[in-house]
Regions:
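Substrate-binding cleft of carbohydrate-active enzyme catalytic domains
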Residues: 2-201
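Flexible loop/turn segments at secondary-structure boundaries
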Residues: 25-31, 99-105, 152, 158-163, ...
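Substrate-binding groove of N-acetylhexosamine-processing glycoside hydrolases
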Residues: 80, 89, 132-150, 171-382
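Core-facing hydrophobic residues within beta-strands of well-ordered domains
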Residues: 290, 430-432, 450, 483
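Disordered, acidic Ser/Thr/Pro-rich linker "stalks" and the adjacent N-terminal cap
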Residues: 362-429, 440-449, 469-480
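Short beta-strand elements bearing conserved aromatic residues within extracellular beta-rich modules
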Residues: 453-455
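Noncatalytic modules at the cell exterior or secretory-pathway interfaces
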Residues: 489-491
Length: 491
């Protein structure tokens, strides 16, 4: 019922493809009659939610276990959804993950892993012929359920670690003349593509399928930015653009201190609307190869149907207009007014969209430039900041601009696994009454508050007088993004 209610909205707002992510390490969600163990075991976890599974050992259990939580779609239910979507002129594209994100399969069929043991590997063993027998049997049943042009095979985030030490994978590489594990993955993707093509279907995969060489007729779904899709299109392959910083609906959409816990990033309605998936600057040879744009909702942190709707709507309206509207016809103010009307319409019909009209918007502290003694002054970094969290460079701490909600907004400096020692040089002796700095914590981004901040002053940059040490009272287990000013006030 939930899926069909979302399909109703997709049809209303002209979203014409439903990409159904049916398998992942956290659970197998489609009935495969040849392999009942997939829905007897791999679809169930002895934890109440994804959090418990992810941090509690990533185990599975039988469906009759008293602690079992999970489920799957029967083949009859899938046929019902596919037909419901067809009547709305929506094509349903299934995804069966391979070779990575396959912990749930390998827990049930450990012989398909490189180690031969459950709970060791997350990738299928590509050197094992049984792997291809299993995948082709699964895909045959999937093809029988979904009449879609494309079958999505995942292809993302394979660890490839097991392949590096696996005798079977080594033998496969020697036999096929493959020089590294990237080419080994490419071999698998090409072989699966040949199987799908023989069944009259086309292969679609995440942009990692570019690694090691792209299969001849593959279509790339670009999520790690736009580079993968552009590279595929330039090489004559079709691409679907879904870069995470514009299209990932599991990202927080407003003040993270009041919104539900979300993935470790930030995406506002306005940012989603600002995306142009096929700008003319890409060139006449590339633009026609870009098929469209897609919004993605990953549900690790989304435990209920109401929460899912809160994350999808109204940002999916922005995705729809990005796909259908020429850039020169887009007007965010006009769109925003219509989005508010749509939110009211959805609420009247029992949906649970984000209440856009009451959005906090940008972090208030980030809106007004700060003028103080340190503005524009030199910072001496005795501990270099990480290139991964470089903000706007050396002047970031004294440019007067405070960070927003998003650690990736080029205003937050970060350090990896080290204490930090730095000096703000005021250039001359001056009276100081307050010293302060903002810090943030993002549990799912592995960004943490300092244990403590020590403030000291010096006349010569050699001998420092401690003023105060301010401790941190936010536990590392706190999952909500949070922000805190550490400061000293005195004379």
């Amino acid at each position: 019922e939930f899926v069909e209610r979302q399909l109703d909205l997709m049809a209303r707002y002209k979203l014409n493809r439903f990409h159904w992510h049916l398998t992942d390490g956290a659970g197998w969600r489609i009935e495969i009659k040849k392999y009942p163990a997939l829905t007897d075991i791999a679809a169930w976890r002895p934890y109440p939610d994804w959090e418990g599974w992810n941090f509690g050992g990533k185990r599975y259990c039988r469906r009759d276990d008293p602690a079992a939580d999970g489920g799957y779609y029967t083949q009859d239910e899938i046929r019902e959804v596919v037909e419901y979507a067809r009547a709305l002129h929506i094509e349903v594209i299934p995804e069966i993950e391979m070779p990575g994100h396959s912990e749930e399969v390998l827990a049930v069929f450990p012989e398909l892993s490189c180690s031969g043991k459950p709970y060791v590997n997350s990738d299928f063993c590509i050197g094992n012929e049984q792997t291809f027998e299993f995948l082709e049997n699964v895909l045959s049943e999937v093809i029988g359920l979904f009449p879609s042009e494309y079958i999505h095979i995942g292809g993302d985030e394979a660890s490839k670690q097991g392949w590096r030490t696996c005798p079977k994978c080594a033998a496969r590489m020697r036999k096929e003349g493959l020089k590294d594990v990237d080419e080994l993955q490419s071999y698998m993707i090409r072989r699966i593509e040949t199987f799908l093509n023989a069944k009259g279907r086309r292969l679609l995969g995440w942009d990692e399928i570019l690694e090691g060489g792209l299969a001849p007729d593959a279509t790339v779904m670009s999520w790690r930015g736009t580079e993968g899709g552009i590279a595929a299109a330039a090489a004559g392959h079709h691409a679907v653009m879904t870069p995470s910083n514009y299209c990932y609906l599991d990202f927080c959409q407003d003040d993270p201190t009041t919104e539900p816990v979300a993935a470790a990033a930030f995406l506002t309605l306005e940012q989603a609307y600002s995306y142009d998936p096929a700008p003319d600057s890409l060139g006449a040879g590339v633009v026609p190869m870009i098929l469209g744009v897609q919004g993605n909702l990953w549900c690790e942190h989304v435990p209920t149907a109401e929460h899912a709707e809160h994350m999808m709507w109204p940002r999916l309206l922005a995705v729809a207009e990005v796909g259908w509207s020429a850039p020169e016809r887009k007007d965010y103010d006009d769109f925003y007014a219509r989005a508010l009307d749509a939110v009211a319409w959805l609420q009247e019909r029992g949906y649970h969209p984000f209440d856009q009209k009451n959005a906090v918007g940008p972090r208030p502290e980030s809106l007004e430039p700060l003028r103080c003694l340190s503005t524009g002054k030199t910072v001496i970094y005795h501990t270099p900041y990480s290139p991964k969290y470089a903000a706007a460079g050396d002047g970031s701490l004294t440019d007067g601009l405070r960070g927003g909600w998003n650690y990736g907004d080029r205003r937050w400096l970060g350090w990896l696994d080290t204490d930090v020692d730095l000096v703000v040089d005021l250039g001359e002796r001056q009276p100081v009454r307050r010293i302060a700095a903002d810090f943030m914590q993002g549990f799912y981004a592995d960004i943490w508050m300092p244990r403590a901040v020590e403030f000291s002053v010096s006349d010569d940059n050699e001998h420092f007088t401690p003023l105060a040490t301010v401790g941190n009272d936010i536990p590392v287990e706190f999952k909500q993004d949070c922000y805190r000013e550490f400061g000293w006030t005195g004379q």
